[in-house]
Amino acid sequence: MFGQSSRFLTKLYRKVMKGKKVAFPFAYLNDLTSDLQSLRSDAQSVDDFLNIDLLERALALRALNLIQSTMADYDASNEPSKVKDNDVFYQAKVTMTRAHLKYLQFFLFRESYKNHSFLDNRIVSQLDTVSRIFCLSDLIEENSCGALFDTGFLQAGSLRFMNRALEKAVADLRPQMVPLAESLYLPDHWMISVIGNKEGDIYEMQLNEAMKTRLNKDEVPEYFERLMMPILRAKL
């Protein structure tokens, strides 16, 4: 999947660099031709890093910087294409593609609800909190926000504020976890869970599923009891 996504992303990059526009949901890639180094964030507090628009911009800029820098080095290399794809720039292309897909996940999720008419408008704020947690945790993970420091978009000390913002977002969401989890009606026969059914019959449910498995429908070879069971019992 990463290979296919990387090749498609490369095609989009080539298209943008030729002066052509790409459409939804890839429109953010049109900024590849702009000066990313000139963009600055004025975020200097925990509340600033809870601004969902700023977080969306941060995810986009991280992906743009990684794509721009990786493809510039890729095109400057004199190695054969296969060597560049499978060896020299393999990990760099995986990293840029992952950043691209993470942004698309965030963007498409937010697009799916921000203009939706909910019976209770308070749901939007809870989904915004989910989006904040997704974005902040991904930027903080393994310091993957390094591309944003590289462009100068984030100021020194931003990582500390991001960690505090993530803690606050998780604390805000915690009381809403059960309502969010139960907001969709998922019958037991549709979405089986290893933690049991809606009545909490965990072991009974697991036993029923195990008894219905196709492995129990075949005839057991006669040598299983004679040769295999002694070994299994010894290990037990």
List each language-model region with its residue ranges.
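Flavin-dependent oxidoreductase catalytic core characteristic
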Residues: M1-L236
